[in-house]
Regions:
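Intrinsically disordered, low-complexity
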Residues: 2-91, 166-192
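Generic alpha-helix detector with strongest preference for long hydrophobic helices that associate
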Residues: 10, 60-64, 91-95, 126, ...
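Secreted/periplasmic proteins that engage bacterial cell-wall peptidoglycan
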Residues: 71-135
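...with weaker cross-activation on analogous glycine-rich loops/strands in unrelated enzymes
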Residues: 80, 112, 118-192
Length: 192
């Protein structure tokens, strides 16, 4: 049993390293910077994300925490774990903008926090600039919906949002209820 865990750890570390190396060039390209030499901005073929239909995360309704689905890419697990770390913190307008660490978060601060943990964002963004983050369209694992006044994300099928739309409470929380993206720019990270 110990040997199997060791093998899984090597695969996981290799996956994380591959994710880091592959996203380094596309990270700059997707956030308006320059792509690394030899990389192609927006090239969805350079992804370490698995092929096939992604599984959905589960919401523990007692704790409000998200449970990553089996086989989720390391970046998705990191995003979910980051969301769990600030889940239930108070809504604070402008929270999470000056720094990823804050006593409370607003919508774009909370979205920036999970994207940063996934290696998809280097500094916090307000909701307006999130409208041009990544590439257009819905992602397989992570999607960001943003307009000039609000931003939220869907990570492995769960909504990460500070608004009480469809369920009670404000502040960063996982929500099982869906929200139509009408009026929002829908964006994703290449391969996710």
């Amino acid at each position: 049993m110990g040997r199997i865990k060791c093998v899984r750890m090597r695969v996981s570390l290799a996956g994380v390293l591959a994710l880091f190396l592959l996203s380094a060039g596309s990270a700059a390209a997707q956030t308006g910077g320059s792509a690394a030499p030899g990389s192609t901005a927006g090239d969805s073929t350079t992804s370490s994300a698995p092929v096939g239909k992604p599984r959905k995360a589960k919401l523990n309704r007692k704790t409000g925490m998200a449970i990553p689905p089996p086989g989720a890419p390391a970046a998705v697990v990191a995003a979910i774990n980051a969301g769990n770390a600030i889940n239930g913190r108070p809504y604070v307008w402008g929270g999470g903008h000056g720094s990823f660490e804050s006593r409370g978060y607003d919508c774009s601060g909370a979205v920036s926090y999970v994207l940063h943990a996934a290696g998809m964002l280097s500094s916090p963004l307000p909701s307006g600039p999130l409208m041009s983050w990544g590439v257009p369209g819905k992602g397989r694992w992570i999607s960001v919906m943003a307009n000039q006044g609000h931003a939220y994300a869907v990570v492995a099928g769960l909504r990460w949002d500070t608004s009480s739309y469809g369920s009670g409470g404000s502040g960063p929380r996982w929500r099982a209820t869906k929200r139509r993206p009408h009026g929002f720019a829908v964006r994703h990270w290449t391969g996710y």
